[in-house]
Amino acid sequence: MAWALKLPLADEVIESGLVQDFDASLSGIGQELGAGAYSMSDVLALPIFKQEESSLPPDNENEILPFQYVLCAATSPAVKLHDETLTYLNQGQSYEIRMLDNRKLGELPELNGKLVKSIFRVVFHDRRLQYTEHQQLEGWRWNRPGDRILDIDIPMSVGVIDPRANPTQLNTVEFLWDPSKRTSVFIQVHCISTEFTMRKHGGEKGVPFRVQIDTFKENGNGEYTEHLHSASCQIKVFKPKGADRKQKIDREKMEKRTPHEKEKYQPSYETTILTECSPWPEITYVNNSPSPGFNSSHSSFSLGEGNGSPNHQPEPPPPVTDNLLPTTTPQEAQQWLHRNRFSTFTRLFTNFSGADLLKLTRDDVIQICGPADGIRLFNALKGRMVRPRLTIYVCQESLQLREQQPQPQPQPQKQEDGDSNGTFFVYHAIYLEELTAVELTEKIAQLFSISPHQISQIYKQGPTGIHVVISDEMVQNFQEEACFILDTMEAETSDSYHVILK
């Protein structure tokens, strides 16, 4: 009886010893010189090796996702098995992302003949940087004024409809596309991974980013808010050609490893498949109406028209006439800041009305916005115009041009008065910036309300009445505020004229 009671205890001791010996024997497996060692026990603890988890697959494991996104860039060969793929990109280079429709026949029939909206983002991979994303992006915007983090290369893209880029969200672009048609989007990432490292002393590793795509379908109100699919991949961005060098270095390192060591790493694939993920949480502006600063044109446009520049908004007038008034409300002041390329400072001036902004002194705005943007904002607030490089004054002497026109059009004025001479001339100012003969021709044609092509040649009357052809060099040597009398005569061809400056 005593012998029977001692047997389980002996078995427990033996089993415990075997487990310890087995763990000890496994702890050395997988170690390699020059690299961080890992424990095989940890590997066996991964979900892929857990029989109890693999025997109960989730309901959606075999589900085919409605869409698939493929980034046409090779993955790094220096990524270990079971780790997420990593893809190297060059700064500013266009990379294709293929938008594929994986729906089975009869699946999601409500999308047939309909468009969907996809939102592209470049976000931080590290959770620590995700918490401070707003501050990080604001710092980047401060160091790179006027630049964007993410752009679409429209001329190279196929099937992209209504692309938009919000000037306040530098890392986001969106567009509509038809899943039943071929769609390829070429993106450009303009920030590099080392721009967000803690401190830059040279040789530091850059932080990884994520390219995330969220796709939505249209709801009953015509707004694209119903989530369909999200996927993302991990990237690192290098200076131009830096990604190619990094890929080559990783490949050469892998070639030096033994076959046994290579088994621990993933092969390099020619393309990167974005894997399913949760939708981006801060999708508060997803709707069908364009936000301030969006380009809402439904036709194709060049990358310059879609880069989020406030100059391409459909509604604002030219900045020259868009003056800020003391009666401007805080909401209107925010729109004025967006239109005049001061989106960076809208948060600072959230509660400022037009009167508040106009009361700021030059020193105030420089202290708030920094020297460069401060001076620009101060000039915009005061409505200051850029002084032209050259100003000349002209007056018409002959009325031949008026007589030759089939219909009366506004002419430079020649008014008669009751002085001793009986007449006096009224001059018109012409402002020149480029100081070229072509620019002078265009300005004179504008003055006479005719086409520049109707002015065959412009001459300047020289000594003894000779006619000298106006060249760029002659225009550049005009004196500031020089006065000229314009004489016109009919050219050899009909409906064109020679203009003589006297």
Curated annotation (Swiss-Prot):
Annotated region described as Disordered, given as residue ranges: 241-268, 294-326
Protein name: Alpha-globin transcription factor CP2
Cited PANTHER family: ALPHA-GLOBIN TRANSCRIPTION FACTOR CP2, TRANSCRIPTION FACTOR CP2
Annotated GO MF terms: DNA-binding transcription activator activity, RNA polymerase II-specific; RNA polymerase II cis-regulatory region sequence-specific DNA binding
Annotated spans, DNA-binding: 133-386
Gene: Tfcp2
Bias (Basic and acidic residues) ranges: 241-265
Example of a GO biological process term: mRNA transcription by RNA polymerase II
Similarity comment text for this entry: Belongs to the grh/CP2 family. CP2 subfamily.
Quaternary organization: Binds to DNA as a dimer. Interacts with UBP1 and PIAS1, and is probably part of a complex containing TFCP2, UBP1 and PIAS1. Component of the SSP (stage selector protein) complex, which appears to be a heteromer of TFCP2 and 2 copies of NFE4.
Domain called Grh/CP2 DB: residue spans: 63-300
Main location as per UniProt: nucleus
Domain of life: Eukaryota
Entry keyword set: DNA-binding, Nucleus, Phosphoprotein, Transcription, Transcription regulation
PROSITE patterns, A to Z: GRH_CP2_DB (PS51968)
Modified residues (Phosphoserine): 353
